[in-house]
Regions:
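An N-terminal assembly and electron-transfer interface module characteristic of large anaerobic redox
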Residues: 1-273
Length: 273
């Protein structure tokens, strides 16, 4: 760095100032981030505490906001200056014509999402991309249902580079399955994909280009689907049939014909063709 002030963290700034023989106590006071907040790489203050502050900082009226994709991430990404994955997702989403709304908060707070994703009780996002671990799936499920938003997930592979991930026969470590797959799916999160890996050399978390592009495209497609009339949507209905064959329509302890008739009737009543 040309000067200590160019270092990405106050710790490094103080260390470089000390090594240069300067008084590190003359450096600016550290920025204290709120327990929960909203982030965007374009914000001069890095993080704001409320949705209203976020929209004001972005120059957007929340009552007339564009289609919005919220990105849930860990506060540690900011504390460790490892926001490249979140920044990349935000850029891809906004390049697609939507607004990105990255946010973080305590994972054990049963009201955490609603505090950051609503204004006056109304959702300020249309889709959520989750990158957090899921610790309380029942609480998260209730929040997702209350918000009425589809949720997909981008997870990280922390055992090496993108090339090593592609070569791995499993793709996801077994120890990650409970918190990043099983509990996430129980909470209602769908389409869980690996979207980041470690960069060789400095082991910084970076996006896997094709995977991150797929996550952003999925989020943008969900935005389009949300505004498309039901009559224009194409829905496939897949059902269980046992024993296998073309001459029967059955399942254990279930009246499958009646269930299908009820489901198709409900879809038709909702405007699907």
């Amino acid at each position: 760095f040309a000067s200590p002030e160019e270092a990405p963290s106050l710790y490094l700034q103080a260390l470089l100032a000390w090594r240069a023989g300067r008084d590190w106590r003359q450096l600016p006071e550290p920025q204290v981030f709120p327990t929960a907040g909203l982030y965007h790489p374009s914000l001069p203050q890095i993080v704001v505490a409320t949705p209203a502050e976020y929209f004001a900082a972005r120059g957007i009226d929340p009552a007339h906001r564009p289609p919005t994709v919220a990105i849930a991430f860990h506060q540690g990404s900011i504390a460790s200056t490892q926001t490249e994955v979140i920044d990349d997702l935000a850029r891809r989403i906004e390049a697609g014509g939507a607004l990105a709304l990255p946010f973080y908060g305590p994972m054990m707070d049963p009201q955490g999402l609603r505090k950051l994703l609503t204004i006056d009780g109304r959702p300020i996002a249309d889709v959520i991309v989750n990158t957090q671990i899921t610790l309380t799936p029942e609480d998260r499920r209730k929040e997702f249902e209350a918000l009425g938003l589809p949720v997909i997930q981008a997870m990280a592979w922390r055992r090496g580079s993108a090339e090593q991930w592609r070569a791995d026969p499993h793709g996801i470590p077994l120890m990650d399955v409970p918190f990043y797959l099983a509990q996430a799916e129980y909470a209602g999160i769908a389409d869980i994909q690996v979207a980041a890996a470690l960069r060789p050399g400095d082991e910084q978390l970076v996006p896997i280009d094709a995977q991150a592009a797929a996550i952003a495209a999925k989020a943008l497609n969900l935005l389009k689907l949300k505004t498309k009339p039901a009559a224009d949507k194409r829905v496939a209905l897949m059902f269980w049939n046992y024993p296998a064959g073309e001459k029967n329509l059955s399942a254990s302890f279930m009246n499958l014909p009646r269930s299908l008739a009820g489901t198709l009737g409900a879809l038709q009543a909702a405007g699907y063709r």
